[in-house]
């Protein structure tokens, strides 16, 4: 792209004061967030525990691999699933290593975004700012902190590597651009269906960048791979049986999903998208106001950057736009794109516009910290609860020959019911103990065998032992 994308730097006294203060706050939240992610002693949800059960085999050759050519599977993600099986087989019992790997992959994606911004002629400081804003965004913290998001890490890495590699080529270099696009689009689609967004994003990039030959060639190659993928997979994606609710789709959903993406970053206590709909009128209104002001700031700074923020951001969300339920990991690519827009728009903003972006960054970095803190809390609970649950199920089974008698557990803290439901859901086994449907969470007033403490420990009810 030409130099006009970044434009001349406009300095002000307000900037000289606001940038250091905002930067310090963002740095503090960043350090605290990644410390919490790296020191997390456990796991966030049932997904990791289910994969731990699948990978609990004697030898890695016995792992239940997904076939690379089974295009009838609802989730055809052989790159993700097979790599995840290997990682889980090796490190499931060492959560610290799992979290270290996820953070490393996440920061690698931030480094790829830095490289893309440099290729778009942003300064080193701008590029670093954009990459850092992405890494501390609530979307990224959610993905980097939950070790069930390998698919999101992989498809975005493929998309960013594609863009950076193509932008490094001479403008007229068509064949190399096409080959690069073919390879990385294929990698992305083998990782997650969200990579269907790569070709539309290349189309958008080609349109806003002066229709460069290298981007046109990349677009055609990526489009061909995407068309072939859809030819093989579209009937399955549209009509195959799927988990109830989670992957239901409707053409009435895109506006709602898009709105959630806009508002979620500015609701700093929200862990997942359900909190957007459940937010109070005041909090919802404030988030909406901030989102509108931020969007207007981009449009005023530069029309092309503003269009990329609004329309490119929607494209980056990809297929999840039509799903009935949204989750923060669906906004991972969106976060990379809008943070890149912020880096490119920064020098063209007046002091007021820069203050708006700084406020948004402080708010979103605080949000990211809150997510990291909650994930760390849940991880500490899981690290205690899962082994205790396996012991309790084993002890309960030894006293009840009738296997239809489920272990009934009450909660000490009812507010954490959702946490324990997720940590108990469809876990076939843990630490060699078969669990399956042998656990039932009940109200404290109902008959129960044991009580789950706030810290995840399990103590037997009076007379139950």
Language-model segments: what does each one mean?
Residues 2-465:
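Polytopic membrane enzymes that build or remodel cell-surface glycoconjugates and lipids
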């Amino acid at each position: 792209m030409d130099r006009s994308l970044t434009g001349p730097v406009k300095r002000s006294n307000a900037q000289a004061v606001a940038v250091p203060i905002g930067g310090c706050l963002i740095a503090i939240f960043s350090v605290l967030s990644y410390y919490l992610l790296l020191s997390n002693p456990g796991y966030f949800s049932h997904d990791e525990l289910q994969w731990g059960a699948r990978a609990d085999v004697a030898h890695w050759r016995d792992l239940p691999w997904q076939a690379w050519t089974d295009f009838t599977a609802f989730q055809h993600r052989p790159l993700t699933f097979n790599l995840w099986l290997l990682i889980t087989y090796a490190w499931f019992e060492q959560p610290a290593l799992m979290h270290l790997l996820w953070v490393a992959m996440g920061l690698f994606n931030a480094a790829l975004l830095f490289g893309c911004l440099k290729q778009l002629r942003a300064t080193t400081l701008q590029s670093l700012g954009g990459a850092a804003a992405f890494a501390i965004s609530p979307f990224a913290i959610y993905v980097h902190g939950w070790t069930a998001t390998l698919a999101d890490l992989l498809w975005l890495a493929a998309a960013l590597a594609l863009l950076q590699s193509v932008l490094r080529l001479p403008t007229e270099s068509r064949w190399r651009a096409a080959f690069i696009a073919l390879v990385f689009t294929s990698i992305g689609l083998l990782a997650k269906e969200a990579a269907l967004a790569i070709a539309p994003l290349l189309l958008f990039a080609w349109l806003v960048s002066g229709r460069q030959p290298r981007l046109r060639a990349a677009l055609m190659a990526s489009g061909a791979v995407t068309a072939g993928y859809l030819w093989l997979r579209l009937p399955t994606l549209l009509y195959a049986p799927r988990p109830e609710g989670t992957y239901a789709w409707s053409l009435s959903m895109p506006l709602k999903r898009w709105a959630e993406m806009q508002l979620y970053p500015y609701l700093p206590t929200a862990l997942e998208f359900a909190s957007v709909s459940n937010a109070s009128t005041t909090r919802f209104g404030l988030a909406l106001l901030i989102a509108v002001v931020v969007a207007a700031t981009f449009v005023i700074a530069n029309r092309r950057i503003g269009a990329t923020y609004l329309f490119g951001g929607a494209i980056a969300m990809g297929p999840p736009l039509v799903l009935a339920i949204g989750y923060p990991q669906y906004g991972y690519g969106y976060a990379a794109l809008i943070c890149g827009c912020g880096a490119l728009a920064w020098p063209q903003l007046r002091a007021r516009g820069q203050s708006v972006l700084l406020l948004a960054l402080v708010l979103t970095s605080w949000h990211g910290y809150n997510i990291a803190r909650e994930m760390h809390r849940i991880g500490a609970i899981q690290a205690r609860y899962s082994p205790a649950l396996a012991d309790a199920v084993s002890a309960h089974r030894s006293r009840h020959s009738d296997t239809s008698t489920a272990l009934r557990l009450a909660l000490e803290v009812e507010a954490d019911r959702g946490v324990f439901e997720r940590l108990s859901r469809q876990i076939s086994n843990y630490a060699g103990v078969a669990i399956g449907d042998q656990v039932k969470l009940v109200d404290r007033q109902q008959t129960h065998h044991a009580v789950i403490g706030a810290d995840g420990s399990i103590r037997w009810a009076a007379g139950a032992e």
